[in-house]
Each structure stands twice: as structure tokens, then as C-alpha cells.
């Protein structure tokens, strides 16, 4: 299975989890910091899919863009996972997990920008 297909599957999982968290937030009450978790998952699932589309069309440098997509998956999962765990289990994933996820999201967006500027290899 290719990296692109794995990332597409992970984006689908992120989207499903984002919808489930949004439903939990809507039906279980607006408490805590959970509101940001579904948004991060849904938005960055779309970003992963868009990045893969750019890679498949050779618009961006493939390896750099795939690194950005992997960063989106890890970072959004870390960010949302920590907020969700804090809301429902009462403890954090690990200290500074949410800000670490946010920082990695910023870095991933910058890496994606770099992938558009970096010269692509000719086959």
C-alpha cells in the first residue's frame, strides 16, 4: 500500500472522529475545551486530502508535501486527542501535548508551502 493511500485512509478516520466529537460536543453539553478538537480533525483531514491531490498531480515536491501531510495527521491527532482525553478522562495525554500538536500543525503548513516552492525532480 502506498503512502498516499495510507494517508487517505487516515484522513477518513480523522474525519469520522471529528464528526463523532462534534456530535458529542453538541449532545453532551458545551463544556471544557472540546470545541476545538473536532474542528482540528475535520479541517486537517481535508488538508491531508488536498495535499495528496497536489502530490498526485505533481504540483508540489512529493516527498516534502508527504512529510507535511504526515505532520497534519500526527499533529491534529495529538491536539484533538489531548483535548478529548482531558475532557472525558480528566487527565492529559502528556504535558504540553496540545501546544506541541499546534506547533507541529504550524510547521506542517510551512513545510507544505516549502513543497510548492522547492523544485520538483524530473522523472
What are these regions (language model features)?
Residues 1-123:
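Polytopic transmembrane helical bundles with strong interfacial aromatic enrichment
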Amino acid at each position: 500500500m502506498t503512502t498516499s493511500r495510507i494517508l487517505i485512509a487516515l484522513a477518513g478516520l480523522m474525519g469520522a472522529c471529528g464528526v463523532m466529537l462534534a456530535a458529542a460536543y453538541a449532545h453532551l453539553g458545551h463544556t471544557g475545551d472540546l470545541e476545538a478538537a473536532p474542528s482540528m480533525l475535520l479541517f486537517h483531514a481535508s488538508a491531508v486530502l488536498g495535499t495528496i491531490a497536489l502530490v498526485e498531480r505533481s504540483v508540489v515536491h512529493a516527498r516534502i508535501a508527504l512529510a507535511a501531510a504526515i505532520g497534519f495527521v500526527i499533529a491534529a491527532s495529538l491536539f484533538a486527542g489531548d483535548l478529548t482525553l482531558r475532557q472525558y478522562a480528566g487527565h492529559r495525554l502528556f504535558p504540553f501535548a496540545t501546544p506541541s500538536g499546534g506547533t507541529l500543525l504550524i510547521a506542517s503548513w510551512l513545510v507544505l508551502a516549502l513543497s510548492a516552492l522547492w523544485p520538483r525532480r524530473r522523472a
